[in-house]
Amino acid sequence: MPRKLDLRSGRPVWSAYRAPAVPTSALTRDAKADVLVIGMGISGAMIAEALTADGHSVVCIDRRGPLRGSTSATTALVQFEIDQPLTALGRMIGKASAEQAWRRSRLAVSNLAGRIAELSINCRLSRAPSLYLAGTVLGPSQLRDETEARRQAGIAATYLAPAPLAARFGIERDGAILSHGNIALDPRKLTAGLLLKALERKARLYAPVEATTIEDSAKEVVVATRGSPTITAQHVLLATGYELTDIVPAAAHRVISTWAIATRSQPRKIWPDAALIWEASDPYLYARATADGRVICGGEDEDFIDKERRDALIAGKSLRLARKLGRLFPDLDTRPDFAWTGSFGTTTTGLPYIGAIPGHPRIQAVMGYGGNGIAFSQIASEIVSAAIAGSEDTDASLFAFSHRQQRHKQSLIT
């Protein structure tokens, strides 16, 4: 079952904002359901809400409890723009597949915003443009090529040369791609809101409950838990975030460490349109504003997951992030009010793995890796819901384990 990781340390900025309480129960006896969701972070919450909306009986378990894993560490830049540029992704998986992956990501962000509005979840959602700044991976000429590739795929994008970039946003860089259709939000409030909607539809939430073994057959899946009760379901959904289970193919993932800071509230110093900002660099810097005018900045990713080493770097990494943010926006007070670190998963292409695990058709896994974890969780909720209903999402093969045995890279906390 899940390999245990301390997914975050430090003090994430979301601790400054109260999220609704999500009541859970103790698992004292065996349980049955149509679907068992293992994990009550953002991915598990989206799946539980979608499945209960479809009329399925759902049980959710988590070894910590709701909102206590990597969800609290995400910076929640909900972008459709995939970590891997469209031009690069096309070389990896083919032009048509790359374009469809980008279009589906864009649709997912739109669908998520619509679902949040439909459910009246107060998660401080704001719509924002994004700026993809020239960096070490893509310079100005490559950004122009990327802009044209997006347009050919039907995705609106505008290249900004240095002068209009500085005039419009006050940023001194060699160029940028301006895009629209992204959102920012409070991930804890969203997760709590989705779980509460699932509860209203009679979902059963148990925590702390740790799954120890999974045994699947042609007809059902039986999950044993620490403390003895078992849960029997027609389908099991693994939404364990970056605590990866032994049943998941080893080629599917790599876990890295990343860091983030948040400043004091300074709404008068926020740049125009509160655009989401990220760099065409590896590792890349990214920044967003909160609803009350704090600035969140993250990056500095490193390829290791040792908790002690990761946590020991919080102070130094925070200073580096503050300096980089200050170079981007000299008028900001970049001193951190909050600083934290987390462990997050990556893939070479920047695309997630979603769907049935090879050889285990009743066990679905949701792995929304990279800088698009929340958008990919929305895609997962759509693909998994269709699969459990007995149909197939038209884009399921793009993200299936059996379709892509990837090399692994690319990163981010967002």
Predicted regions and their residues:
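Glycine-rich FAD pyrophosphate-binding loop
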Residues: 53-73
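Redox-cofactor binding/interface segments in oxidoreductases and associated redox assembly factors
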Residues: 38, 80, 238-239
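N-terminal Rossmann-like FAD-binding beta1-loop-alpha1 element of flavoenzymes
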Residues: 33-60
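Active-site substrate-recognition segment that forms the wall
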Residues: 110, 118-126, 230-361
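Helical element adjacent to the flavin cofactor pocket in flavoenzyme catalytic cores
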Residues: 148-149, 176-234
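Extreme N-terminal leader/targeting segments of oxidoreductases
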Residues: 1-35
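Rossmann-like flavin
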Residues: 89-197
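C-terminal catalytic lobe of FAD-dependent flavoproteins
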Residues: 310-311, 326-414
